[in-house]
């Protein structure tokens, strides 16, 4: 493994995350706190009151399925289209809508053999800056939002009429394909440019699963586009297969990836309810120093992912997610695992060095046969 200790001098505190955790620190020593629920009336404890707003009453409406005009619930027909009005929840589901979620990178070539000595040398020399990385994040965000805009127009979607799960689902599908599974114990997973979600679960868990798995996709895209930029090639399945290999065949890189997704998910859920098992199993394979720096790198990736997501998941939608979470849960929060959180990030210079270490070591140690098998999945 590369010497990641050289990144120690670039570590700095993530003040925003520290402040969020500091708000609940007094609760970490308590065994539990109880949330009493009765339909839409919530009695929040001190922490939940800070994190959630009260549910606002929403006027009941109906929508014309043809022109999408909104009517009071007492109306039955659209006078212009002469069709029966429907309640928003009875409209065609976002689940069944096909969206073009293509995210591209345009280079000057389309090499079918990425793992050449010349390319490995280019990766190791790493002519890449933080400005290049910011351009990549902006490009991915712009393409995703264009896909979202096209989907809304092509399907005449009324965003205001969607529930919070459908809004998050629509946003996720603008970046990556989403499919549903009805077996296994996992809430969901990301694999070869597809997110799989168990739709038997509560809405709140489907929402956080979508955010978690979308984060895996975006981190993968960051590294794919970085590689394409350095090698000056179009995005293709060869590059994607190499990056999937790098992220999945090293406990260190897997922890970076998993902790990043965990940290992003935590931005949109409620402290005390998040599942930590996604990364605790991985970190058992690493010593404490490698665990700390892997989490710091993952947390830095998470900052960029969160900023991208917050372009759509603004304050109001984040509060809607938290409110949905409280409506669904009957469990008491457990703050003890917050001690596993990492509140550090890397400076710009340190972050670029971290990406260099990940890619240079990964390219040099790639198993070509495994990469070929991965290529067949795209």
Q: Which residue ranges define each predicted feature?
A:
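Post-HEXXH active-site segment of zinc metalloproteases
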Residues: 204, 220-256
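Residues immediately within or flanking Cys/His clusters that coordinate Zn2+
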Residues: 61, 75
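Pan-zinc metallopeptidase signature
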Residues: 278-378
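Short Cys/His-rich micro-motifs in 6-15 aa windows
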Residues: 82-92
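Short alpha-helix carrying the canonical HExxH Zn2+-binding catalytic motif
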Residues: 203-219
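Auxiliary, metal-adjacent structural segments of Zn-dependent hydrolase domains
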Residues: 103, 115-195, 200-203, 374-378
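An active-site-proximal "capping" alpha-helix that borders the catalytic cofactor pocket
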Residues: 254-269
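Short cysteine-rich clusters marking metal-coordination/redox-active sites
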Residues: 64, 78-81
């Amino acid at each position: 493994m590369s010497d990641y200790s050289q990144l120690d001098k670039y570590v700095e505190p993530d003040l925003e995350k520290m402040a969020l955790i500091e708000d609940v620190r007094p609760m970490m020593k308590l065994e539990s706190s109880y949330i009493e629920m009765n339909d839409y009336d919530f009695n929040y404890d001190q922490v939940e009151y800070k994190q959630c707003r009260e549910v606002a009453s929403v006027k009941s409406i109906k929508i014309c399925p043809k022109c999408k005009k909104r009517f009071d619930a007492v109306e039955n027909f659209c006078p212009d289209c002469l069709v029966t009005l429907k309640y928003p929840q009875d409209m065609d589901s976002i689940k069944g809508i096909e969206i073009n979620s293509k995210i591209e990178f345009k280079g000057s070539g389309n090499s079918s053999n990425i793992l050449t000595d010349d390319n490995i040398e280019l990766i190791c020399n790493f002519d890449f800056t933080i400005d290049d990385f910011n351009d990549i994040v902006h490009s991915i965000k712009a393409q995703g939002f264009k896909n979202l805009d096209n989907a809304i127009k092509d399907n005449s979607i009324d965003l205001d009429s969607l529930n919070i799960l459908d809004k998050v689902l629509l946003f996720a599908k603008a970046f990556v394909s989403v499919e549903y599974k009805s077996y296994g114990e996992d809430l969901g997973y990301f694999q070869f440019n597809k997110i799989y979600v168990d739709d038997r679960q509560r809405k709140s868990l489907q929402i956080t699963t979508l955010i978690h798995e979308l984060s895996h996709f975006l981190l993968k895209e960051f590294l794919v586009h970085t590689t394409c930029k350095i090698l000056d090639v179009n995005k293709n399945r060869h590059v994607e297969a190499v990056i999937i290999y790098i992220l999945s065949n090293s406990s260190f890189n897997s922890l970076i990836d998993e902790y990043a997704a965990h940290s992003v998910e935590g931005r949109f859920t409620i402290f005390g309810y998040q599942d930590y098992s996604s990364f605790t199993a991985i970190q058992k394979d690493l010593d404490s120093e490698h665990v700390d720096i892997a989490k710091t790198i993952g947390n830095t990736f998470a900052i960029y992912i969160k900023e991208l997501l917050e372009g759509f998941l603004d304050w109001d939608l984040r509060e809607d997610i938290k409110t949905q979470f409280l409506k669904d849960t009957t469990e008491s929060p457990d703050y003890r695992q917050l001690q596993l959180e990492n509140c550090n990030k890397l400076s710009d210079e340190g972050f670029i060095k971290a990406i260099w270490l990940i890619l240079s070591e990964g390219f040099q140690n790639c198993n070509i046969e495994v990469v070929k098998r991965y290529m067949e999945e795209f």
